[in-house]
Amino acid sequence: MLGMAACAQDTKTETITVTNEVFPACDATHPTGQCDAGQICFEAECVDSATLCSPTNLTGACTAGTICFAGGCVLETALCSPTAPTGPCELGSVCVEGMCVATASLCSSSNPTGTCAGDLTCIDGICGTPEVDPCSVHVYTTQPTVVAKTATSQKAVITVDGLQFKDLSGDGALDPYEDWRLLEICRAKDLVSKMSIPEKVGTMSEGSRVGSGTEDGTIPDNVTAAIVEKFERYALIRTGSRTPQQLAVYLNNVQELAETQPWGIPVTITADPIHGFGLSTNNNTGEQSVNPSSVVSPWPYPLGLGAINDPVVTRQYGDTVRREFRAMGFTWQLGPMADIATEPRWARVQNTFGVNAYAVAMHTRECIAGFQGTGVGGLPVGIAATMKHFPGAGADEDGMDSHSYSGRYNVYPGGYFEYHQIAFQAAIDAGVAAVMPCYSIFKDQFEYDPEQLAAGFSATLITDYLKEEMGFTGMVTGDWGTLGHKYNAESIPTPLRAAMWLWAGSHQFGSDRESNFQDAYDLGYITEADIDGAVEKILEMSFKLGLFENPYVDPAAADVRSAANLEAGFIAQKKAIVLLANAAHEQSGNQATKFLPIDGSRYKDANDDSTPQVGEYLDDTNNDGTIKVWFDGVVDRLVADPEKPDDMTSVAGYGEYDYTAAGSATSLPIVQATGLADADIAILRISARKGSYFGLDAGVPLSFDGAFPGQSNDGSIRNSIQDRNRVIDAFRARDGYTDAAGTAIAATNPNLRIVLVMHFDRPGIVKPFINGLTTLDELPGEAGSYPLVSDEANIEQGRGKGVDAFLVEFGAIDRAVLDFVFNQNVPTSPEGYRYGEAVLPMEIPSSDAAVEAQFEDVPADTVNPTYKLGSGSTL
């Protein structure tokens, strides 16, 4: 079933046929030349994009000498074989000594009698020889950096066999858990054997008691108590209030405190994904803002990486996160999300890679490789990745979320449960360090969840399926407050639920009281052996990260928002923009004018004299010899506001932006318009209506003003109505309307062209803006009112009265949007790149009714979507 057919996601290209713009056609001389829409230049010929190898066409065409494998073209000689002993294998398999072997068949804690390489035998999940204890074998030989804060902790660096080790126990001898030459699970077993029950229970907790850092690096008393009295060693940090350098200093001090404790167990610091950012609209003023992290470099959402659909970019993103996290002292991320965004109302689709499970698998694999340092040193220089939310949170009933009781079910009316496992299997094959189960009950999936409990409490899901069938061998960590999300277990006492968590095969709990697990032990629900097994897997991850040798970082070197990182994220922001419409709203036939990119020299030669004249310039819609552009963005200017610098202002080669132009003999000047009334072109930035995954009893509609169908309070509509009104105001300026008193208000600018840019954190229903509205009038007697865009009767059924261009972004500063629409600062890699190569990683439905009728688990299945999965075109 994991081979279920993929949904279509085509790459689209279009030619630009403007007199003074020449793009060479695809041929042997121009192997990256232009082709018709829906085609791409492939080996000097134009071919249909859908015929090429991709995650959506697993048998597509590749260049000579390569074959289509797992959705990508690879050299046949590079596949797993005796001559390529580390080559790729099919999903669910890994290369062992040149042969593809099922991941789940390998020797591990999940399969204690599994397969080992060579002549080795699986002994209790560890490969070795029967006559030698595998936990006594020195498998690592390269000396790592060992750092001890001896002056404070009284823990010394000792020398054994000419090698350095950290005397974490302070006994002057080399204990097995201090010996970095041994397997990590063996070190963990030795350490666990020395710990008390309270120490073990504290280790099982992943909470936020370490705080968010302090300005001067001092450790608050409550943090000291968490480490010293509660024995907590796994902590989530919320960033935002401290600089990277302050965090590095603070966390060094936290590590130094931990080193002073009896076993010297370091603290493993984690964070949620923090590199993406969004656009929001103030529901009172209509003012817009972007909210990138001030601590790390801003990148587009993972959904934007899915739109770019380039594994190189996704690996670069993962590597950037790794380096920036490590520089601050973070060594674990609660990501990436391997969920499939098949339910478009879900509030978290922007944090997935899309709806195509094979594409999501590719991006998940590359992201994990970037996080975990694959190819550059592995976990000792990486951060532990956490695939979530197993076995998939994307099929939420009615688009709700299991953070809330009403959204406790994931449903599969289309029978696509196994489709949602494809990316998780890819993550397991890639060696992902941890997994976070979903809060949800997987409704009626009795084969996988016969207990009908939240995933982390289901032994069938966690042990039988995740570990034994899929081959996962890492640590199972809980989502926040797992014991409180007690769906179908409400009548079970909390200590017994804690026991059920361990019985299922889960290991660590998030933000739950340690006393619940201590009570489970004291009441006899769980044994010390149950606790030991969990703590061993938790500590194994920290040993793999190299923290027991050196958990410290250099604050002076914590150059997190470096120029290189900012530029890489900025380029990705631009590459993720998808162009979905680029033609005048009064288009007729197939010869509509494409007026993007905005350029003072673009014209159509109306009189065949090969000389541009006033009236022929494409972007001078008012024919007055000047192109006036109104930009309604975060900062409503074509020229940077020095009082509001963006992320790129301080980066060499960028500085303050200016998209105005003086003009020349063959080009018109471009100036800032004062508003809609005098603009040739208006660029409006809006945000799709926000979802919510807390406290709602129904899915939030995707339309900008559709009524919330539940009884709880959905505040998103106030913000989205502000954006709706801004679009209608532009329509009214162009087309006129009738006010509440019945007075006809004439158009103030009938030649206005409108570019709509939507921030895509959910697929907002834009059909009313694309097709246009049948009425722009105020409601009789209601001054200042606007027509409902969620009312199908108010929407034109054919296109012609809507916006002139439409594009979506997945996290972009104003400069990224303006670079795109003005076709400036085009990325130079890959060779021949053009803006607009990204395509939609999920469809944009046409109505709330179409969304309600689709199946939550099936990808891209709404009727007559406004834009299909894979839509997009180049400038």
Annotated model-derived regions:
Residues 12-20, 147-148, 596:
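Generic detection of short hydrophobic beta-strand segments and adjacent strand-loop junctions
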Residues 133-875:
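Glycoside hydrolase catalytic-domain context in secreted enzymes
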Residues 11, 19-20, 56, 110, ...:
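Generic cytosolic/nucleocytoplasmic N-terminal low-complexity/intrinsically disordered segments
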Residues 14-133:
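Secreted, cysteine-rich disulfide-bonded mini-domains of extracellular proteins
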